[in-house]
Amino acid sequence: MLLVDVATASVDVGAMSSRLAKTARIADLLSRAGTEQDARLVAVTVAWLSGELPQRQIGVGWAALRSLPAPAAAPTLTVTAVDAVFSEIGAVAGKGSQARRAGLIAELFAAATDVEQTFLRRLLTGELRQGALIGVMADAVAKAADVPAARVRRAAMLAGDLPAVAAAVLAGGDAALARFTLQVGRPVGPMLAQTATGVADALDRLGGTAVFEAKLDGARVQIHRRGSDVSVYTRSLDDVTARLPEVVEAALALPVTDLIADAEAIALRPDGRPHRFQVTASRFGRAAARATQPLSVFMFDLLHVDGADLLDQPTSDRVRVLDDLVPAAHRVDRLVTDDGAAAQRFLEATLAAGHEGVMAKSPNAPYEAGRRGAGWLKVKPVHTLDLVVLAVEWGSGRRTGKLSNIHLGARDPATGGFVMLGKTFKGMTDAMLDWQTARFLELADPAAQPATSGRDPTDGHTVKVRPEQVVEIAFDGVQGSTRYPGGMALRFARVLRYRDDKSPAEADTVDTVRAFYEHG
C-alpha cells in the first residue's frame, strides 16, 4: 500500500463530520490493507490514522521539519518503507545522531508528494487531528473485518493496543479476538470520566447515589504485580517502573500475589498538601529525584486480584476488595452518599485540602478500560480569565480555510503589552469559527506577518493580529512553562465566548494569572 493512500484517507476523514462516513472511509482503507496479508501494514495504518507512531518517540519535532525539500511529483513511497525509515530514525544514537536524523528526514520528505509531506509533518509533530480516534477507529476495524464492534472495543480495551487487535482480526476474523484477555504485565487503557457541573448534577445522572472520591492532581499510574515483579505504567501506557520506586514498594507491601491497580502518584508537601503538578511530573524523568522529592501513591480501583478479573464487577464490589487489601494511607478519601449537602461538604473539604475536585462514580458501574464511561463523572471548579487574542493559526482537516488555534495573552500593566500564556482550539462551534475567521482577518496586522508571505495573512500558518479582541477562557489550572515568556501556561484552556463588551484594557493581568499559579 502506498503512503498516498493513507494520506488521502486522512484528508478525506478530516473533512467529514459524519461518524458513519468516517468509519466507512477508514474501513475501506483497512480492507485494502488486509488483502495484502501483512499484519504490520494493518497495525501501522491504524496507528497513523489515530495520530500515533508505533515507534512512539523517534526524536523528530518541529525544529527538524522547518526546512524541507520540495515535494516529489509522483507518489512512490510505501507504508512499509516509511515505517522502516521511522524505525531507523528512532534507532539513531551517539555522536552525529542529529545530523543523521536530519539526513533521513530530508531523504524521506524529498520522496514524498505534497499531500504526503503534509501528512508526515502532522504525524511527526502530533498534530494529526482528523477525528479518527479510538472510537471511530474501533468501529472501522470492526466494519472492515465484519465482526461486532463491541467485540473489537473489548479486545482493544484488554490489549491496550488497537493496532495489534486490528492486525489480528483482519487476518483471523472474530476467532482471533479470543486471545485478547486481561493479563498482568500488559497495561490497558485507563477508564476516563465525563464531566458534571456539580455534585447535584452528578447525583442526578448517577441515579441518586454515588461513590465520591478525592480527585488528586497527580499522575495517573497503573500498577501490575505478579509475585515479586512489579511494573508501573502511565496513562499513555509507558513503562515508568524504574522511576517510581515508591510505587513499587507500596505494591509489594500488599498481601496479594497478583494485582492490577489504578492509582495516582503525587508529590505532597510536609503538611500533606499537594505540590504543583509539575513537581510530580518532574519525577517521571528522574528516578534520582526521589531523595529530594518523594512521591506518595494512592490507589482507587482494582482491575485484577489473585487470578480474578474485576473489570465487570460493579464499583461497590471493587471498592470493597480495595478496602480489604490496601491500607488507608494508600487509598484516596471516599464518601458514599445520596445526600447532596454531604457531597457538597466533601467537595469543599477536598478543595480546601488543595486537591482538584472529586470523582463521582456509579456504585453499579463496571470498569470500562480505555473508555470515557458514563459511570464516572468528574466535578471540579472551572476557572475563567478574560484574555486577548495575539495571533491565530489556520486550521486543518474540517477546519481547513478557517482560523482556528488562537494565541492567548494576559495584560502586562508594567509594559502596556501582553504576555502569551498558550494556545487553544477547544470549545469552538462552527458558527464561532466562521465569525472569528472574518474577525481576525479584519484584525490582521500586515506589518507583523512574515516577509516570506508578502505580508499576506492568508499565506502562511499563523496570522498575527492587533491585540484588540477579548475572549473568555475556561481553564483547569496554571503550570510553569519555559515555552512562553511569562514562564506560565494555562492547562486545558478552552473558549467560552468572545467578549465584545470588553476592551483589551479590561483584560485580566499577568499578575492575576500568577496568583493562580502560586496559590491555585
Swiss-Prot record:
ATP binds at residues 213, 220, 235, 264, 300, 372, 378. The active site is at 215 (n6-amp-lysine intermediate). GO terms for biological process: cell division; DNA biosynthetic process; DNA recombination; DNA repair; DNA replication. It is an enzyme of class 6 (ligase). Its EC number is 6.5.1.1. GO terms for molecular function: ATP binding; DNA binding; DNA ligase (ATP) activity; metal ion binding. Its cofactor is Mg(2+). Pfam families: DNA_ligase_A_C, DNA_ligase_A_M, DNA_ligase_A_N. It comes from the Bacteria. Belongs to the ATP-dependent DNA ligase family. HAMAP family: DNA_ligase. DNA ligase that seals nicks in double-stranded DNA during DNA replication, DNA recombination and DNA repair. This is Probable DNA ligase.
